[in-house]
């Protein structure tokens, strides 16, 4: 081992409490998307209690996912004796980044066929190119893959990621003043600014994933119990520090209201509450790890599955297309149970097929890819 390589660490331990936290975030995400898409506004008024609290908590799911994605990505990053990440692993990560980008755009594909894209109006193109959480994840995975290739230790990798994350947070108010769409193509500007409807622009949302890399580095190489203790310390002290900084910047107590979502005080407030909520769930993780941790590892499948059920694709109608914000609260909760059951149940079945029927799993994947290609072309 060279002097630049990370110290040898024990064999990798699965930190199941991270999977439990991710599962909790998924449950809240599914019910949040479902109720928001289907329940009438007069029965779900996010300006009045208790739905204003529910709406604020919904805003924490994305930071939680991004923080956990960064942490897990760091935990599974392996290096050779010379400190380098093997080329095959780098290519695999880059491939995943491109797949996430493609999947993010596919879920909002605005035409029946690729050939029909030429007929789209500028407004439809603008909606199609809005950046969601999958596009943000894909871009940052490509960035972190490049960073992993350039660094020679996990410590350096995490330090650069933390530095970039801090830079994104601090630069957000300045980037918000720039008309990115006047000087960049729509597809690129949408990654930088929410002005045309992007829900997860790089500034500041990318910072959560990059800061998560630092969490992963703090847990790496530790036993499960040691890692859990360290994680709880990070969530408690980091959350309190972020909320304190938010209060200083806003000259008032969090939660901070910010209609744009781009202010420093709001970003630190959201980070602080997300960390505290993650710590709260992690404390209860040992009681539920055996039951829910396996599903927590399939966050991408759950995300895609419930969106398909709700919103469909150009060739498949979802529930929201027929009942958009027209249900009662009781009907909405019943649909939450249905969508959640089908999503998590479907993921569990697919996991079972993958483990016990590899040929069938390969056939299903190939068939899905072939049907998708046929739909896009013909």
Label for each model-derived stretch:
Residues 2-378:
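Alpha-helical transmembrane segments and their immediate juxtamembrane cytosolic regions
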């Amino acid at each position: 081992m060279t002097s630049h390589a990370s110290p040898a660490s024990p064999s990798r331990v699965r930190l199941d409490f991270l999977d439990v936290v991710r599962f909790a975030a998924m449950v809240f995400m599914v019910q949040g998307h479902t109720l928001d898409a289907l329940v009438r506004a007069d029965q779900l008024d996010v300006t009045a209690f208790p739905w204003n609290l529910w709406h604020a908590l919904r805003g924490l799911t994305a930071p939680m996912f991004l923080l956990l994605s960064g942490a897990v990505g760091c935990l599974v990053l392996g290096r050779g004796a010379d400190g380098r990440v093997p080329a095959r692993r780098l290519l695999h990560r880059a491939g995943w980044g491109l797949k996430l980008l493609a999947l993010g755009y596919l879920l909002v594909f605005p035409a029946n066929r690729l050939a029909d894209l030429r007929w789209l109006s500028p407004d439809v193109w603008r909606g199609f190119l809005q950046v969601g959480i999958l596009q943000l994840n894909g871009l940052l995975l490509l960035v972190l893959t490049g960073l992993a290739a350039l660094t020679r230790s996990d410590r350096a990798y995490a330090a650069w990621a933390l530095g970039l994350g801090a830079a994104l947070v601090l630069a957000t108010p300045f980037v918000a003043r720039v008309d990115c769409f006047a000087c960049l193509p729509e597809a690129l500007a949408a990654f930088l600014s929410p002005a045309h409807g992007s829900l997860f622009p790089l500034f500041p949302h990318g910072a959560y994933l990059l800061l998560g890399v630092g969490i992963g580095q703090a847990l790496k190489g530790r036993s499960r119990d040691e890692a859990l203790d360290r994680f709880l310390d990070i969530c408690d002290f980091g959350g309190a520090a972020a909320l304190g900084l938010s209060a200083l910047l806003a000259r008032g107590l969090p939660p901070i209201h910010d209609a744009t979502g781009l202010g420093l005080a709001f970003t630190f407030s959201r980070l602080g509450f997300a960390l505290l909520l993650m710590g709260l769930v992690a404390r209860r993780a040992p009681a539920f790890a055996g039951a829910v941790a396996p599903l927590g590892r399939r966050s991408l499948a759950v995300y895609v599955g419930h969106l398909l059920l709700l919103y469909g694709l150009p060739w498949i109608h979802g529930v929201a297309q027929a009942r958009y914000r027209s249900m009662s609260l009781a009907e909405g909760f019943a649909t939450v149970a249905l969508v959640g059951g089908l999503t998590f149940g479907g993921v569990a079945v697919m996991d079972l097929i993958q483990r016990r029927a590899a040929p069938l799993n390969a056939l299903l994947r190939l068939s899905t890819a072939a049907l998708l290609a046929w739909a896009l072309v013909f």
